[in-house]
Curated annotation (Swiss-Prot):
Protein name listed in UniProt: Maturase K
Localization annotation: Plastid, Chloroplast
InterPro entries: Domain_X, Maturase_MatK, Maturase_MatK_N
Family: Belongs to the intron maturase 2 family. MatK subfamily.
Function: Usually encoded in the trnK tRNA gene intron. Probably assists in splicing its own and other chloroplast group II introns.
Organism: Quercus ilex
Cellular component GO terms held in the UniProt record: chloroplast
């Protein structure tokens, strides 16, 4: 029964909404590291002593609260590197505890809301590519889109206030506020892109939780107003937890504009409005007129400024006509184009041709940003001329080729749904020639001389198309199957953007 002691304590603290004591429980950090309570119990018996031990956590919190925590002698830091003030170690240890503990109320609330209901898991919806079939189905029938760059909160207090409606433990929120302010800068509490980048890399789980809470607050209010104004309730939105004083906040927000809450903005009543988001970028598409789209733009800017105290300017939202402009989303350039088609129709003895031009969503590979990513990774220069990869010249030939092929396959799979493959062929050519130049430099030869020495099948996989693999595996595959495979394919197992294609 000892192995369940930690879980019983978690449940007892949850009943009283106490999270602060969990920071001083060592099993919280064991769970944060993925060890589990069973492993924690075993390690405790043999003298569990790592950087997340209870004694170190207590001393770090005490040090953080002291007024003179920056005055630490160099000798003390050398003698006790864990107890001396190390900002990176300090923030990493505490943020791991904050992340695992603050998720407990949300997880338990989710479990209680799903009691007695069958949980249906759609694993394919985790894929980034699952967004594009939705876009292909809905966007060809729409007229305008708003390309929205969601602003980051300019002050750390906004993140704490967002959690205040969900976490009731004042002591925990006070320590969280103190930790965030101390970590950012004692002189500046303004979040900059540089500080966000450093914080997200050193504390990824904690940063993602805070940012997702902020995004969830913004989207839940927007969807709430959307549902109140529409007779067609949204069925595809995820589970949104109810927050305290939501209606009071909405009413206060309405008072800012001197409008009654019952006066729903007219653009929200559009039944053809669709919204998609990934990370900090979202698209709001509609069949409305440009006037209503501009009203929607002003509404969103006021929502961020008046409700979230986030400074946002009109340039962060660009309204474009789908038939004339492309959308830069998820490293694709998507645009609605007319697809002309001629259909022969025959009625009794008369036959005639029908010219049909339905709208179609085209997704193409953005060649210029992708070449910029390849140049940054030293595969080519700024204009796209391949160069040798110096850091891989000390590897074996087999390892060099495999690493280049791995990058090529990942990019090929990610852009498999592209309407036009020409840009992808150019990227493959750059990677292939960069691989050849790397091998030639390793063997102290020229690229032309190296290609003459090796077998013609040495780089065959660089030229093998995606449709060619099905011919190798199924030699007697039908023509229809080959044509289907060589067309646009959305892989539903891609859960993150390739590093080279993530140029946003």
């Amino acid at each position: 029964m000892e192995e369940y002691q930690g879980y019983l304590e978690l449940d007892r603290f949850r009943q009283h909404d106490f999270l602060y004591p969990l920071i001083f429980r060592e099993y919280s950090y064991a769970l944060a590291h993925g060890h589990g309570l069973n492993r924690y119990m075993l390690l405790e018996n043999i003298g569990y002593d790592n950087k997340s031990s209870l004694l170190i956590v207590k001393r770090l919190i005490t040090t953080m609260y002291q007024q003179n925590y920056l005055i630490i002698s160099a000798n003390d830091s050398k003698q006790n590197p864990f107890f001396g003030y190390n900002k990176n170690l300090h923030s990493k240890i505490l943020s791991e505890g904050f992340a695992i503990i603050v998720e407990i109320p949300f997880y338990l609330r989710l479990i209680s809301s799903l009691e007695g209901a069958e949980i249906v898991r759609f694993y394919n919806l985790r894929s980034i590519h699952s967004i594009f079939p939705f876009l292909e189905e809905k966007f060809p029938h729409l007229n305008y889109s708003a390309d929205i760059l969601i602003p980051y909160p300019a002050h750390l207090e906004i993140l704490v206030q967002t959690l205040r409606y969900r976490v009731k433990d004042a002591s925990y929120l006070h320590l969280l506020r103190f930790f965030l302010h101390e970590y950012s800068n004692c002189n500046s509490l303004i979040i900059t892109n540089k500080s966000l980048s450093i914080f997200s890399k050193s504390n990824p789980r904690f940063f993602l939780f805070l940012y997702n809470s902020y995004i969830c607050e913004y989207e839940s209010i927007f969807l709430f107003l959307r549902n109140q104004s529409s007779h067609l309730r949204l069925t595809s939105s995820g589970i949104l937890f109810e927050r305290l004083c939501l209606y009071r906040k909405i009413e206060h927000f309405a008072e800012v504009f001197a409008n009654d809450f019952t006066g729903i903005p007219c653009f929200l009543k559009d039944p053809f409005m669709h919204y998609v988001r990934y990370q900090g970028k979202s698209i709001l598409a509609s069949k409305d007129t440009p006037l209503l789209m501009n009203k929607c733009k002003s509404y969103l800017v006021n929502l961020w400024q008046c409700h979230f105290d986030v400074w946002s300017h009109a340039a962060s939202i660009r309204i474009n006509q789908l038939s004339k402009h492309s959308l830069d989303f998820l490293s694709y350039l998507s645009s609605v184009r007319r697809n002309p088609a001629v259909v022969r129709n025959q009625m009794l003895e008369n036959s005639f041709l029908l010219n049909n031009a339905p709208n179609k969503l085209d997704t193409i590979v953005p060649i210029i940003p992708l070449i910029g990513s390849l140049a940054k990774a030293k595969f080519c220069n700024a204009v796209g001329h391949p160069i040798s990869k110096l850091t891989r010249a000390d590897l074996s030939d087999f390892e060099i080729i495999n690493r280049f092929l791995h990058i090529c396959r990942n990019l090929s799979h990610y852009y498999s749904g592209s309407s036009k493959k020409k840009n992808m062929y150019r990227i493959k050519y750059i990677l292939r020639l960069s691989c050849v130049k790397t091998l030639a430099r390793k063997h102290k030869s020229t690229a032309r001389a190296f290609l003459k020495r090796v077998d013609s099948e040495f780089f065959q996989e660089f030229f093998t198309e995606e449709g060619g693999f099905i011919s190798l595996i199924f030699p007697r595959a039908s023509f229809a199957l080959r044509r289907l495979y060589s067309g646009r394919v959305w892989y539903l197992d891609i859960i993150f953007i390739n590093g080279l294609s993530n140029h946003e």
